[in-house]
């Protein structure tokens, strides 16, 4: 890890420890987004549930983060970074303890929601502190230092989760957060500055509530199709309510002088295409960390630790491709890379339908590694094209909306995957783990087709990959 730079501004404690504190918060957030996936079958057995009904444990965390993220910047400006970071760690730690003690799926999901509220504030508030505590010329170096643990979290999460399930129990994937959280609280009191904005402005509470209602209602309606056993009338009602709330937010934003997210953001074509493409393409990508461990354990007979180890090729290839792929994007442009790679990503996802218990190990590893490289290419290109043409005065709001869409896409990916698993289980009769392989195959093909279809969105980019708005100045998204 590179040496942490030192800020010139006054902080509450050691500036290098401040960076470590923010980095560990980022690590905790990303670790808990992946560590539960390999433990879901063990959780299901312990709680007396079907492994195919455990999606709420993942969706509750990701959806809560999507809902809370838009409010974090204003909360930090209004109440101070130290107070909000303390609150974030406290809620995350309490949520972890509640998860470990949960005796039912309902209470476990509620605890994951509490954990998600804290997790949603860790990185945005930490990034805000680094931005204000370090001079501009040191910001990129400081954020690079902070980002490394965030990359390590998803890398070790599935493997650590599977190992803990085998050597102890699934409860320990949450209990390991407790000592880290307690140390984080003490470190925040000593080393986190309580930076506040002199005039944070008025928060668009009405717009925020409409947007939150839209996200939650649409997600719950899809979740109602995925094994919750809700009546079709309730599912349709929730979907209509969600779409109505989304339309109401748009009308509200058009009339409000200071909306949560201004509609003017979508006048920048590259941002509009990037956000829409991110949402739909990430449904496929977001489904995979949920589906793959279930496939390996339920249909192919892997142990939790073995399933976790099989996720390592995905993570390693994802990290290894990031540097060379930027040269490819610069050479070919955004549109050809995104259109071609989105189709390829859909084919890779559908290709997991070909997995069998007799498949050679080397071929399975190669398939997972290739998927990791293609998936990482998709993220790199989508992230860059979405933010590159935003004007400086819109960058903060645009980045916040983009972060929300990323988490929403992950949540919807798991929700859609669970709904498809449930539907294909009914149609194909594969409810028992030994009979579930055809169900997983059909689900992977459907998710792959949905992902490949989202390539049509990226086709709307200009041929050179630039935004179509003629006067939008280019800013460095790094």
Region locations from a protein language model:
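Intrinsic disorder in cytosolic terminal tails and internal cytosolic loops
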Residues: 1-14, 459-478
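Flexible interhelical linker loops that connect adjacent transmembrane helices
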Residues: 8-12, 137, 183-212, 254-269, ...
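12-transmembrane solute porter fold
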Residues: 15-31, 36-40, 47, 51-61, ...
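Hydrophobic/small/kink-forming positions within alpha-helical transmembrane segments
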Residues: 63-67, 97, 151, 155, ...
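Small-residue-rich packing faces within the transmembrane alpha-helices of Major Facilitator Superfamily
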Residues: 66, 86, 93-94, 117, ...
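Helix-loop-helix hairpins in multi-pass membrane proteins, especially solute transporters
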Residues: 69-206
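Alpha-helical transmembrane segments of multipass membrane proteins
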Residues: 97-98, 163, 216, 220, ...
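C-terminal membrane-cytosol helix-exit motif in multi-pass small-molecule transporters
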Residues: 178-196, 212-224, 241-255, 454-462
């Amino acid at each position: 890890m590179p040496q942490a730079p030192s800020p010139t501004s006054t902080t509450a404690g050691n500036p290098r420890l401040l960076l470590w504190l923010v980095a560990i918060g980022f690590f905790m957030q990303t670790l808990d987004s992946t560590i539960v996936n390999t433990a879901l079958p063990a959780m299901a057995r312990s709680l007396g549930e079907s492994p195919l009904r455990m999606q709420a444990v993942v969706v509750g965390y990701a959806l809560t983060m999507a809902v809370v993220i838009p409010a974090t910047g204003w909360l930090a400006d209004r109440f101070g970074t130290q107070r909000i970071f303390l609150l974030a760690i406290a809620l995350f730690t309490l949520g972890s303890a509640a998860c470990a003690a949960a005796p039912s799926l309902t209470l476990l999901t509620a605890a994951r929601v509490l954990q998600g509220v804290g997790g949603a504030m860790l990185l945005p508030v930490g990034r805000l502190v680094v931005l204000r505590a370090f001079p501009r010329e040191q910001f990129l170096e400081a954020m690079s230092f902070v980002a490394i643990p965030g990359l390590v979290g998803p890398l070790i999460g599935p493997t650590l989760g599977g190992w803990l399930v085998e050597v102890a129990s699934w409860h320990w994937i949450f209990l390991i957060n407790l000592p880290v959280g307690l140390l984080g609280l003490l470190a925040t009191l000593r080393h986190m500055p309580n930076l506040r904005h002199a005039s944070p402005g008025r928060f668009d509470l009405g717009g925020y509530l409409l947007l939150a209602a839209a996200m939650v209602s649409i997600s719950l309606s899809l979740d109602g199709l995925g094994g919750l056993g809700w009546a079709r009338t309730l599912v349709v009602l929730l979907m209509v309510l969600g779409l109505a709330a989304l339309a109401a937010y748009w009308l509200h934003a058009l009339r409000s002088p200071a909306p949560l997210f201004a509609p003017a953001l979508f006048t920048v074509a590259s941002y509009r295409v990037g956000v829409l493409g991110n949402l739909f393409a990430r449904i496929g990508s977001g489904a995979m960390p949920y589906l793959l461990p279930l496939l390996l354990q339920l249909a192919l007979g892997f142990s939790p630790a073995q399933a976790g180890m099989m996720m390592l090729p995905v993570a390693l290839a994802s990290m290894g491709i990031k540097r060379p792929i930027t040269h490819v994007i610069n050479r070919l442009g955004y549109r050809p890379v995104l259109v071609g790679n989105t189709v390829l990503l859909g084919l890779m996802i559908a290709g997991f339908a070909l997995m069998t218990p007799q498949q050679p190990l080397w071929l399975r590893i190669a398939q997972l590694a290739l998927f990791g490289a293609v998936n990482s290419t998709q993220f790199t290109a989508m992230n860059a094209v979405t933010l590159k043409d935003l004007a400086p005065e819109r960058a903060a709001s645009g980045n916040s909306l983009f972060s929300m869409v990323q988490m929403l896409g992950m949540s919807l990916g798991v929700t859609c995957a669970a709904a498809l698993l449930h539907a294909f289980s009914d149609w194909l009769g594969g409810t028992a783990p030994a009979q579930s392989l055809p169900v997983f195959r059909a689900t992977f093909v459907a998710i792959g087709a949905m992902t490949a279809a989202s390539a049509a969105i990226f086709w709307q980019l200009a041929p050179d990959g630039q935004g179509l708005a003629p006067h939008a100045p280019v800013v460095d998204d790094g």
